[in-house]
Amino acid sequence: MGLMMTFIPTQKELFNKNIEALSNLFLKESLKEIKSSKFELILGKDNLDINLKDTSDNTFLYENVIDELNSMLNTYNDKYLLYPVLYFYGFGNGILFKALLQNKNHQHIVVFEKDIEIIWIMFHILDFSHELQSARLMVLQTSSLDIEFFSNFCSSKPFFQFSRIYFLELMSHYYERFHEDVLELNKKLVQDFKDSILSHGNDPLDALQGIEQFVYNLPQMITHPSYKELLSKRKGISDTAIIVSTGPSLTKQLPLLKKYASKATIFCADSSYPILAKHNIKPDYVLSLERIPLTSEFFNNDFGEFDKDILFVLKSYVHPHTTKYLQKNNRNFMLVSTYASFINYLKLDDFGYFNMGFSVANMNFLLAIHLKHKNIVLIGQDLAYAKDGLSHTKDYSNLDKHEGHFQRDKNKYTTQAYGDNGKVESSFVWTLFRHNFEQDVQKIQKYLDTKVYNCTEGGARIEGTIEKPFLWACENLLHKDLN
């Protein structure tokens, strides 16, 4: 039961002034809707002695307002004087932020709050409009933050640039009651900062190899069809795309895939291609983005007539052995570029660009989006080890390269299982791929009318996807043969 608080006209004006300065629309509307609060305002003799009493359990926001404020200020002026960005969990009475922002080195103070009644009261008491308007004070409600927020925030200036000095400070002991929310928030921020750092590349030799192979592949790129042509000819030609990856769950899906293959557009990973050939299931597209020679070996074969009408779509800095093997028996291929400064300078714009993500499955998924498929069905996308420790489907040609990996990763990357069926063991790389997928899926569902079905029936849960049996997808989405 909330207490009706009576604010005088000047306090109401102050609240409106603060609200006007707030750029976060969701928080702005949420604050306007509050009419009462469980908190009681406690004012001491000192102007800075502003406390709140939580009447639901008779606890206070601060045990000693002035002492805690001075202690925090001393710590921050001593240790963090030059930090461009500071992070707090809990708005408290807000006085600390006004004091810290006197220091011009602090470009932003980012405050996460779960209980916005605290902000509602303090916006009636103190003027934060200047700090809010300049965005030096950023206030965020934890329940409103989605995957897209974390992805955008952790990759934007100056937060990304100073991600190495990130730490989250509790405003006061009162906020310890939200420990689960604090830990979850911290985990997401740390993970997304890591993902953003990795997305910029973490190996200069890898980058140089990419540039070298891109230059080597240039003659092949400009003498084969362009990405622009692909979009103009094939955009929107079928509703449903099935993306075939090489997880342990793939084996059980192959008979059904074979039965319905003519009714969907099939995108497959380079590693799935020899497996589909073995089972005589013809994909429409085979994609590859790795720059190592081992991946090229998936194409060191000759499946004869099977390869007719398959289009091999390669990232423009794959290893040159890939194009050599494809040319050897006249397979149809094209090279497509991602966004990269070096590539953009060459102005070969017809041959790009699309963001391909970290894995060939991400690349398949994003190409399917650009080709305007309305339903995207994932199979073999486990992103986790099988119960017996297998990393990939039994037909996968490089299984021996992953021996011992299950033991190496056990209990380090545990995650929610598909179908909410307990937990599964994942790896560092798969966790990265999964986060990449989850970010893309959430953006797609927000801005496009595309449905993403995870029909792997095993492995890790990919948040945001619709989990359905593969049989359901085949029976409900695939009705007629494609020409």
Spell out what each predicted region is.
Residues 2-241, 248-265, 274-278, 285, ...:
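N-terminal donor/sugar-recognition subdomains of glycan-related enzymes
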Residues 89-90, 245, 313-315, 379-380:
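Short beta-strand segments
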Residues 113, 273, 281-290, 368-392:
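Glycine-rich phosphate/pyrophosphate-binding loops
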Residues 113-118, 270-273, 288-295, 316-318, ...:
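Short, acidic/turn-prone active-site loops that include or flank metal/cofactor-
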Residues 266-272, 286, 312, 361-364, ...:
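Extended, hydrophobic alpha-helical segments in both membrane/secreted and soluble proteins
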Residues 269, 305, 315, 357, ...:
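Active-site-proximal structural scaffolding
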Residues 320-374, 379, 383:
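Active-site/ligand-binding-proximal alpha/beta "capping" segment
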Residues 388-421:
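Active-site phosphate/oxyanion-binding loops
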